[in-house]
């Protein structure tokens, strides 16, 4: 038996060593890696080169007079966008329903900060040239003020590298989607080659960058989602050539993305001077006089709201990445929203969801705790067997197996039911970590009978570390109710687990800590009930 335990210990150690990297990556403790076949350094790559399907032409394009550059504003119930008439690049994109802090007078979230303007978000590259700098532009129309259900279009006409360029940007009052229809035509009678690229740029989307909520460059290409958050990798650059549905910059809660309709393209991403830059470039296209083709590209500037993203084109819904156990996380988020509709508090909704999960797994947990209690009663007899046959491991294992058989105890009975619940924990972890509903959602808001702010944002850590410390105490108490490990080394390791988890959870979003704390309390109650009946 001891030999078997030694072998098991070695195997488990190997699993921990190999699996830790995957676990820490999944949990967000270390940046995710990207398959080597998808990674190419863009350091030496020229500025976004693009290829495009035949754009629209206006037979010999008529001459036009460039207009003086000025700001153009688009206002909807969801956001306020400010563009420049010289090519349609973004100057601001402020989200009306999301703010930088929990204070009532907190500024709205601005996805395009001033330092990002220099990389021309919503910019257009033509034959490698930044059209907003090298072209001449005229703007047709005025500001847009859209009410619910309305759409509006801004039209920018330009002359860039011998091509007449017409950008039509359509805005939707009920969505964060911006749709561009791009028309190209030679300014003379001869055909011209056009290479078009769409640019994007933003600063960090997570002020006070947390290891659990990093700003990263992400993309959905060739049917799979990928992302890079490592500063070193992003400063070197990312270069992807493939079938690209969308690419952009995102955090757990917000996304700025470009999504070309014809998806064969080259993606270039880079972090430079604190600004995340993305360009999606289409292949070269011959543009003939009289060409009427239209190039369509979608953009997303807004929160990662599931319903809106799932309704958007180009698989933008895949930006909400819930990891390996997404099939578990998605229904859990739905249940969380269901409870919230009735209680109006996400902290309470998390507790109700935890209770529901505990009830579902009650039979398995009951079996596990009952098996552990039987093992606890067997420990004195097992200790005597180890002492009696300390020099004869084979005989010791035989006697221990005889005891297990006599008292009908399965030594693994306490662990196996728990293992079944691990995927649910990881699924709920990802669900709570990526649920924008928890951003600035209060639980208690203030310490009782005081004005001290506490647990006013379930997406932020507990400012006074009360919940993680109490959680650590519950883990210690739960450990006291659990039979001690027979192996002294294992017992010492288990003794330090509450300390390790407490430090680990200190900076966790408080919503996650509330779940874990509530789960521990329910587990202690269940163990106490089983002990009382024993």
From Swiss-Prot:
InterPro entries (alphabetical): Membr_insert_YidC, Membr_insert_YidC_N, YidC/ALB3/OXA1/COX18, YidC/Oxa/ALB_C, YidC_ALB_C, YidC_periplasmic_sf
Family, as annotated: Belongs to the OXA1/ALB3/YidC family. Type 1 subfamily.
Transport as UniProt keyword: yes
Membrane topology according to the record: Multi-pass membrane protein
Species the sequence originates in: Nitratidesulfovibrio vulgaris (strain ATCC 29579 / DSM 644 / CCUG 34227 / NCIMB 8303 / VKM B-1760 / Hildenborough)
PANTHER family: CYTOCHROME C OXIDASE ASSEMBLY PROTEIN COX18, MITOCHONDRIAL, OXA1
Pfam families in UniProt: 60KD_IMP, YidC_periplas
One Gene Ontology term from the biological process aspect of the record: protein insertion into membrane
Chief location bin: membrane
Subcellular location: Cell inner membrane
Summary of subunit composition and partner proteins: Interacts with the Sec translocase complex via SecD. Specifically interacts with transmembrane segments of nascent integral membrane proteins during membrane integration.
Protein name per its UniProtKB record: Membrane protein insertase YidC
Single GO term (MF): membrane insertase activity
Record-level GO cellular component terms: plasma membrane
Role: Required for the insertion and/or proper folding and/or complex formation of integral membrane proteins into the membrane. Involved in integration of membrane proteins that insert both dependently and independently of the Sec translocase complex, as well as at least some lipoproteins. Aids folding of multispanning membrane proteins.
Keyword entries, A-Z: Cell inner membrane, Cell membrane, Chaperone, Membrane, Protein transport, Transmembrane, Transmembrane helix, Transport
NCBIfam families named in the record: yidC_nterm, yidC_oxa1_cterm
Chain segments annotated as transmembrane: 7-27, 319-339, 342-362, 413-433, 493-513
């Amino acid at each position: 038996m001891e030999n078997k335990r030694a072998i098991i210990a070695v195997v488990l150690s190997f699993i921990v060593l190999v699996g830790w990297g995957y676990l820490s990556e999944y949990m967000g403790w270390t940046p995710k890696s990207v398959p080597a076949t998808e990674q190419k350094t863009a350091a030496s790559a020229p500025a976004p080169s693009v290829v495009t399907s035949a754009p629209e032409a206006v037979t010999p394009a008529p001459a036009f007079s460039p207009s003086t550059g000025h700001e153009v504003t688009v206002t909807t119930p969801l956001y306020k966008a400010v563009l420049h008439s010289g090519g349609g690049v973004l100057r601001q994109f402020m989200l009306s329903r999301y703010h930088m802090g929990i204070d009532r007078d907190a500024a709205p979230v601005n996805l395009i900060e001033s330092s990002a303007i220099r990389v021309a978000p919503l910019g257009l590259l033509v034959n490698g040239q930044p059209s907003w700098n090298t072209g001449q532009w005229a703007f047709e129309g005025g500001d847009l003020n859209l009410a619910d259900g309305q759409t509006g279009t801004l039209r920018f006409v330009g002359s860039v590298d011998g091509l007449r360029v017409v950008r039509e940007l359509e805005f939707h009052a009920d969505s964060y989607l911006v749709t561009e229809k791009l028309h190209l035509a030679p300014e003379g009678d001869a055909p011209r080659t056009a290479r078009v690229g769409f640019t994007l740029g933003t600063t960090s989307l997570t002020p006070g960058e947390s290891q659990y909520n990093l700003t990263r460059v992400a993309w959905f290409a060739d049917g799979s989602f990928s992302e890079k958050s490592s500063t070193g990798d992003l400063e070197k650059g990312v270069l992807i050539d493939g079938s690209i549905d969308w690419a952009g910059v995102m955090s757990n809660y917000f996304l700025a993305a470009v999504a070309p309709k014809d998806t064969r393209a080259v993606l270039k991403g880079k972090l430079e001077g604190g600004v995340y830059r993305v360009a999606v470039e289409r292949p070269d296209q011959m543009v003939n006089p009289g060409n009427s083709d239209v190039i369509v590209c979608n953009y997303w500037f807004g929160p990662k709201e599931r319903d809106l993203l799932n309704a958007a084109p180009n698989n933008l819904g895949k930006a909400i990445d819930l990891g390996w156990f997404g099939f578990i996380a998605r229904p859990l988020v739905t249940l969380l929203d269901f409870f919230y509709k009735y209680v109006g508090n996400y902290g309470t909704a998390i507790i109700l969801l935890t209770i529901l999960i505990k009830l579902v797994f009650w039979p398995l947990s009951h079996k596990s705790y009952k098996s552990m209690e039987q093992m606890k009663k067997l420990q004195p007899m097992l200790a005597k067997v180890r002492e009696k046959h300390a020099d004869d491991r084979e005989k010791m294992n035989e006697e221990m197996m005889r005891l297990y058989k006599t008292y009908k105890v399965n030594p693994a009975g306490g662990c196996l039911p728990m293992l079944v619940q691990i995927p649910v924990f990881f699924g709920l972890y990802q669900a709570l970590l990526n649920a924008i509903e928890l951003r600035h959602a209060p639980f208690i808001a203030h310490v009782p009978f005081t004005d001290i702010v506490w647990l006013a944002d379930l997406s932020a850590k507990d400012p006074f570390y009360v919940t993680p410390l109490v959680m650590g105490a519950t883990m210690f108490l739960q450990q006291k109710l659990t039979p001690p490990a027979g192996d002294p080394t294992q017992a010492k390791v288990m003794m330090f687990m509450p300390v390790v988890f407490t430090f680990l959870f200190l900076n966790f979003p408080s919503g996650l800590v509330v779940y874990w704390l509530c789960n521990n309390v329910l587990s202690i109650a269940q163990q106490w009930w089983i002990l009382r009946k024993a």
